[in-house]
A protein has these predicted regions:
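TRAFAC-class small GTPase G-domain
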Residues: 1-156
């Protein structure tokens, strides 16, 4: 399939927020509760929109400090970012501001962003209310979604 448009989307967030679980759920249609990311994984997804063939390369990054330089390199040419936090861990929402600065310093201007509150299946342990995520998304001028790790509601 020859693509008319090729996009790159990087998934960023702190360690243990479920970035890799989202990635695996989206591409392999399975759910794993414990996955350790080491470095970077990437996979393409193909779409057709209004007659245009689109290839989107999704890049899953490890959240550990030692992998920041890898994330930094991918950001230079990325078209969009999915910022992920864990709704059961307030600190991961607070770290989104760090990631926003990281993106602003290392990517092209006006990059597309989505803020994604993960682990809605653990809502009984919720530390971040929907409104908090939505307010931060408004501040970052991006869309906000929440989802369960186990189910694929908003991924497409």
């Amino acid at each position: 399939m020859s693509e008319n448009i090729i996009l790159k989307i990087v998934i960023l967030g702190a360690s243990t927020v479920g970035k890799t679980s989202i990635f695996i759920r989206y591409f392999q249609k399975e759910f794993k509760t414990t996955i350790t990311s080491v470095g970077v994984d990437f996979k393409p997804k193909f779409f057709k929109l209004e007659g245009e063939k689109i290839k989107v390369n999704y890049i899953d990054t490890a959240g550990q400090e030692k992998f920041k330089s890898i994330s930094q390199n991918y950001l230079k040419s990325t078209d969009g970012v999915i910022l992920v936090f864990d709704i059961t861990n307030k600190e991961t929402l607070d770290l989104i501001n760090y990631w926003e600065d990281f993106i602003n310093k290392n990517s092209k201007p006006n990059i597309g962003k989505i803020l994604f509150g993960n682990k809605l299946d653990l809502a009984d342990n919720r530390e971040v209310e929907y409104e908090e995520g939505k307010n931060l998304a408004n501040k970052l001028k991006c869309k906000y979604y929440e989802d369960r790790r186990k189910y694929r509601i908003y991924y497409e």
